[in-house]
Structures are given as structure tokens and as C-alpha cells.
Amino acid sequence: MLNTLLVVGFGGFIGAILRMFSINLVNKFFPYSISLGTLFVNVLGSFIIGLLFSYAQNKGLSPLLKSFISTGFLGAFTTFSTFSYQNLLLLQSGNYLHFALNIILNVFLCLFAAWLGFIIFK
């Protein structure tokens, strides 16, 4: 159990740092009302989790590695709480078009990315 906790914690540490750098980098080059950095990490994280579970079903993956990637790394790399807060700010500012667009893009692109990642190892 202690090994799992340490592995998840280390994965979370790496995921959180990469999320911060990724969001800042993308938003630096694409400074729009919608945080494309958050969209990027959510889509990429959805793709990676699709790959992970498809690979695990077909080839097998140790429970420790699965915990490291899915719970640790991806749990910290992707961010629904930031997504929710950003949407709240768009809604409060009356920016309804960007509010709707941000929700639609995040939900559909993340679902598509997870599906795409999943079918790669099918």
C-alpha cells in the first residue's frame, strides 16, 4: 500500500509540474479568452488515458504503473476544477459565446481524444 501511495504521489508531482508548464506555454502563444492551455492538457490527458487503458486491456500493465499514470500523473495533469472556474469567470463576465464554446470544445475534444487513444491498441 505504501508503494502505491508513493507512486501515485510521484506521478501527481510530475503531472502538476507538467500541467503548469504546458498551460503557461500554450497560453503564452495563444492568449485568448478561452484557456487553450487548459483545453490542451485536458485533450492530451484524455488521449493518454485512452491509450493507457486500451494498452492495459490488450497487453497488461502492472497495477502500480497504472496507478502512477492514471491516478497520479493524469490526475494532476488534467484539471476539471480549473476548467470549471474558467467557465464560471466567462459566465460572470457575460461572455456567453466563449463560455459555450469552451464547454463544447473541452467535452467533445476530450471524449474524441480518449476514444482515439483507446482504439490505437485495439
Swiss-Prot record:
Q: Where are the transmembrane segments?
A: 6-26, 33-53, 60-80, 101-121
Principal place of residence: membrane
Q: How does the protein associate with the membrane? A: Multi-pass membrane protein
Molecular function GO terms recorded: fluoride channel activity; metal ion binding
Top-level taxon: Bacteria
Location comes to: Cell inner membrane
Entry keyword Cell inner membrane: yes
Output the InterPro entries linked to this UniProt entry.
Answer: FluC
Quickly give the catalysed reaction.
Answer: fluoride(in) = fluoride(out)
Its protein name is: Fluoride-specific ion channel FluC
What's the gene? Answer: fluC
